[in-house]
């Protein structure tokens, strides 16, 4: 996950062709972060869980009717705009906390 964040954050600052709207992006990011944490915690080494993680991520993207490419380009767009990216991550944390309270 850190590698993905580093690569995407350091990409050129260009507007994505079809940036995913903030609310939808928050929903997707929340699910992506949770599934990444699950696999990192359970397996430790990326080489052990990468194929399974990719399948799980593809299911998340399919559920939200976006491609991996659309998600990654939108992630890059928001990451290149620190204020918006911070807002997205704060909303992801808020959403995660709300889900914990309602369980």
Locate the predicted segments by residue.
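Sec-dependent signal peptide recognition
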Residues: 1-4
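C-terminal motif of bacterial Sec signal peptides marking the signal peptidase cleavage site
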Residues: 6-9
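Bacterial signal peptide processing site
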Residues: 11-14
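Post-signal peptide N-terminal segment of mature Sec-exported envelope proteins
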Residues: 19-39
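Compact alpha-helical subdomains of small soluble proteins
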Residues: 43-103
